[in-house]
Amino acid sequence: MFHGSMVAMVTPMHPDGAVDEVSLARLVDYHVEHGTDAIVAVGTTGESATLDYDEHCHVMRKVVEAARGRIPVIGGTGANSTWEAIKLTRCAMEGGCDATLLVVPYYNKPTQDGLYRHFAAIADAVAIPQILYNVPGRTACDLLPDTVDRLADISNIVGIKEASTIERVHDLVERCSDRLDVFSGEDGLSREAVLAGAKGVISVTANVAPQQMHDMVAAALRGDEEEASRIDARLAALHSALFLESNPIPVKWAVSQMGLCGPSIRLPLTELSEQHHETVRQAMKLAGSL
């Protein structure tokens, strides 16, 4: 259903913290024009944790409106409350999103049975296609392959964004790829993941180098390892630099350097430390983004 380079898009904000709707629409146009294959609105990179429910729904609707059917929109609707996730997922469906991305519940650390029941309940409540998102480094909770294998039997659970190890990607592709698509959630592993059978990447780097990420993933999807490796070598420093501080701090600053939005970010996150500016800037130049 989805494939290629899918951007986990930043949410532009004014200095007072209000959502910058003009820049939001500009970003959507930019991604349409520069090869991005789908947009994730209000995921982790889109500052979902610091948007309230009404803002969350509003941004998803605005991205859909700006997309005008030119590019698929995936709404980030995960929460550590099942009922909140259902509400957000329903809002995404009613707002015109093509699918949703559901992060593993964070902080409250459910059991594997709890995770199964959480995602099954959302899938049962809202008929929209849903992509699971496993990022144990941020959630302190790991959605294990046995649980993914069970969830893959639910018809509207169509994929998983896996942000752990390349070994896990291999395992999920082997177990589940006949029923759901596997996507890399780690930019630095995306080339290897796609060559191993993943259908693409949900990418932070694509905010800054969308055409390059599209071209790299497209090469890997067609099995052109040499071309994928050549492009990825130019992106490697950027993959790393965008995580010098907590995501989305560096990428928000990087996008601002491209003139696409301002650098403002909501507390408790803060703008990128000046000591990291030059490292990010040089990585952007190497990638061809500046």
Swiss-Prot record:
Q: Where found, per UniProt?
A: Cytoplasm
Q: Detail which positions bind pyruvate.
A: T45, I202
* Pathway stated in the Swiss-Prot or TrEMBL entry: Amino-acid biosynthesis; L-lysine biosynthesis via DAP pathway; (S)-tetrahydrodipicolinate from L-aspartate: step 3/4
Instruction: List, alphabetically, the PROSITE patterns matched.
Output: DHDPS_1, DHDPS_2
GO molecular function per UniProt = 4-hydroxy-tetrahydrodipicolinate synthase activity
State any GO BP term from the record: lysine biosynthetic process via diaminopimelate
Q: Where is the active site?
A: Y133 (proton donor/acceptor), K161 (schiff-base intermediate with substrate)
Write out the entry's keywords from A to Z: Amino-acid biosynthesis, Cytoplasm, Diaminopimelate biosynthesis, Lyase, Lysine biosynthesis, Schiff base
- What's one Pfam family here? DHDPS
What are the cysteine partners in each disulfide bond? none
- Main subcellular localisation: cytoplasm
**Catalyzed reaction equations:** L-aspartate 4-semialdehyde + pyruvate = (2S,4S)-4-hydroxy-2,3,4,5-tetrahydrodipicolinate + H2O + H(+)
InterPro entries registered for this protein in UniProt: Aldolase_TIM (IPR013785), DapA (IPR005263), DapA-like (IPR002220), Schiff_base-form_aldolases_AS (IPR020625), Schiff_base-form_aldolases_CS (IPR020624)
One GO cellular-component annotation of the UniProt record comes to:
cytosol
SUPFAM superfamilies noted in UniProt: Aldolase (SSF51569)
Residues marked Part of a proton relay during catalysis (site): T44, Y107
Specify the domain of life of the species encoding this protein. Answer: Bacteria
Instruction: Cite the EC number.
Output: 4.3.3.7
Q: Does the keyword Cytoplasm apply?
A: yes
Q: Which Gene3D superfamilies does its entry note?
A: Aldolase class I
* Family note: Belongs to the DapA family.
Role played: Catalyzes the condensation of (S)-aspartate-beta-semialdehyde [(S)-ASA] and pyruvate to 4-hydroxy-tetrahydrodipicolinate (HTPA).
Subunit: Homotetramer; dimer of dimers.
List the protein's name: 4-hydroxy-tetrahydrodipicolinate synthase
Q: What is the lineage of its organism?
A: Bacteria, Pseudomonadati, Pseudomonadota, Gammaproteobacteria, Chromatiales
Name of the encoding gene: dapA
